[in-house]
Amino acid sequence: MRAIGSGIQNVLFADPRTLRTHSRTSSGVRAETPEADGIHGVGMRRDVGYVMDVGSPAFVQALDDAVVAVMIEKASAVENLEAMLSVKGVDMVQFGPADYSMSIGLPGQWNHPRVIEAERHVIKTALRLGIAPRAEISHPNEAKAYLDQGVHHFCMGWDVSVLFDYFKTEGGALRDLLGAG
């Protein structure tokens, strides 16, 4: 995996639809050892100092410590959720309301009762199976509802939305100053 080889310590797999398409995701991150049951071998990459730590115990430990997250965002993934979260090596799950709403014929309706119920189902199932759920929020005030459900991991904002908000606010302030002069 290029991300792991670049030194990234966590991977989010998006769009799994069925157990068949998802069953090998975490094994691609884990070391190819009898204990980890992974398929990630050694190579000349940044995560191993290009040569110095190739195949070392530290290399294996780093792969074992990497966080493997799965984005559940299709109707078929929600229907197969328990089996998908039972795949060895999955550490975290995140629900994707935008893609999910499209997959059930409700594009853009992230707050539709069916979408909200699917998200709750993902959170409850993850907690029951010992998988950490993660929620996407835009602002800290959105966290309380998730904390009440047992969620303690969050993705707050996205790089493009953070930049857009900054440019809109700061650019607007500059525009006002230029207009006043």
Please describe what each predicted stretch is:
Residues 1-181:
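Expand to "…catalyze enediolate/carbanion chemistry for C-C bond making/breaking, isomerization
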